[in-house]
Amino acid sequence: MNRTMFKSKIHRATVTHADLHYVGSVTVDLDLLEAADILPGELVAIVDVTNGARLETYTIAGERGSGVIGINGAAAHLMHENDIVILITYAEMTTEEAKAYTPKVVHVDKDNKIVQIGNDPAEGHTRGLMRPPFALNNSALN
């Protein structure tokens, strides 16, 4: 049996532009994609922290070092410039693979520059954010 598991995320990125008339997808700085182990064309879930919207789309590589997080096409009705978003990927794994897998969590600043890369999906590196109550640290699970 395979399980769908959390693979990686880019945490609390800022939308740099939203283009309603582009043909779908999300454009992401190539540095961020590589840091989060996300390929161009890969399926991502995007959660908008600002307004609660959630959607799925695919990635397009943006200019390296640009900090671009561009919401394209119909998704621009839901997510707007300066919204805070989380881009999440999942992967199919066997139970054994899932137990051994270490996810990638890329924390960024307001300019979408990497501030830390970790592997704990519940760890916050943004001022004012805390670990959710009762959430175990990854090391406590081993």
Curated annotation (Swiss-Prot):
<dbReference type="GO" id="GO:0005829">
    <property type="term" value="C:cytosol"/>
</dbReference>
<dbReference type="GO" id="GO:0015940">
    <property type="term" value="P:pantothenate biosynthetic process"/>
</dbReference>
<dbReference type="InterPro" id="IPR003190">
    <property type="entry name" value="Asp_decarbox"/>
</dbReference>
<comment type="subunit">
    <text>Heterooctamer of four alpha and four beta subunits.</text>
</comment>
<comment type="similarity">
    <text>Belongs to the PanD family.</text>
</comment>
<keyword id="KW-0704">Schiff base</keyword>
<dbReference type="InterPro" id="IPR009010">
    <property type="entry name" value="Asp_de-COase-like_dom_sf"/>
</dbReference>
<protein>
    <recommendedName>
        <fullName>Aspartate 1-decarboxylase</fullName>
        <ecNumber>4.1.1.11</ecNumber>
    </recommendedName>
</protein>
<keyword id="KW-0456">Lyase</keyword>
<keyword id="KW-0068">Autocatalytic cleavage</keyword>
<dbReference type="GO" id="GO:0006523">
    <property type="term" value="P:alanine biosynthetic process"/>
</dbReference>
<feature type="modified residue" description="Pyruvic acid (Ser)">
    <location>
        <position position="25"/>
    </location>
</feature>
<feature type="binding site">
    <location>
        <position position="57"/>
    </location>
    <ligand>
        <name>substrate</name>
    </ligand>
</feature>
<dbReference type="Pfam" id="PF02261">
    <property type="entry name" value="Asp_decarbox"/>
</dbReference>
<feature type="binding site">
    <location>
        <begin position="73"/>
        <end position="75"/>
    </location>
    <ligand>
        <name>substrate</name>
    </ligand>
</feature>
<comment type="pathway">
    <text>Cofactor biosynthesis; (R)-pantothenate biosynthesis; beta-alanine from L-aspartate: step 1/1.</text>
</comment>
<comment type="function">
    <text>Catalyzes the pyruvoyl-dependent decarboxylation of aspartate to produce beta-alanine.</text>
</comment>
<keyword id="KW-0963">Cytoplasm</keyword>
<dbReference type="GO" id="GO:0004068">
    <property type="term" value="F:aspartate 1-decarboxylase activity"/>
</dbReference>
<feature type="active site" description="Proton donor">
    <location>
        <position position="58"/>
    </location>
</feature>
<feature type="active site" description="Schiff-base intermediate with substrate; via pyruvic acid">
    <location>
        <position position="25"/>
    </location>
</feature>
<keyword id="KW-0865">Zymogen</keyword>
<keyword id="KW-0210">Decarboxylase</keyword>
<keyword id="KW-0670">Pyruvate</keyword>
<keyword id="KW-0566">Pantothenate biosynthesis</keyword>
